[in-house]
Regions:
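Class I Rossmann-like S-adenosyl-L-methionine
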Residues: 1-174
Length: 174
């Protein structure tokens, strides 16, 4: 249990230290290089919390940083999260809902420009609401399957419990 609060505290610490002088990916890599106590799972979760914060922080300007982290995680996740289960167990049933439904659940009345500030610069062919809300989801990662491994790769992903979409014979979206 305290591990999850440690994740929140560490993410909060990282965000307070970050000044924007360098790309965040480089900054957080240096942070973890200096702090050897974090394993790969810890680094992954803490990084995810930080990136969720960057996607959603402008939606909640008047709340504490740690609560922004939790709300960001809630909005950007569709899988069960131990942090959400611990901090806001009443939100667990909403995790599988769409980002738009989650925003309504949190009673967030913000403008779409608060998610993506350059919405007015988009072409008319782009649906501004769908485009802004798409920033709350992690984009797919595409895997190219080499010839001869068309059956092996999907089997290994299924065995590992990783959900994926078969795009064609040689491509998978994770």
């Amino acid at each position: 249990m305290s591990r999850y609060y440690s994740y929140l505290n560490t993410a909060e610490n990282i965000l307070q230290q970050y000044r924007g002088a360098e790309p965040f990916a480089i900054f957080i890599k240096k942070f973890f290089a200096a702090e050897k106590k974090y394993g790969s799972g810890d680094r992954k979760m803490i990084s995810h919390l930080c990136y969720c914060y960057f996607r959603t922080a402008t939606l909640f300007p008047d709340i504490a940083l740690q609560e922004k982290l939790v709300k960001g995680l809630f909005l950007c996740s569709d899988q069960p999260s131990d942090i959400i289960s611990l901090v806001h167990p009443e939100w667990v049933d909403m995790l599988s809902k769409s980002p738009k439904e989650k925003l309504e659940f949190l009673a967030c009345k913000k403008n779409l420009a608060d998610i993506f500030p350059f919405i007015s610069e988009c072409s008319n062919d782009i649906n501004p609401e769908a485009f802004a809300i798409s920033h709350l989801s992690q984009p797919d990662l595409f895997i190219r399957i080499r010839p001869g491994f068309e059956k092996l790769v999907p089997e290994k992903l299924e065995k590992a419990g990783i959900t994926f979409r078969q795009i064609n014979e040689s491509a998978i979206a994770v």
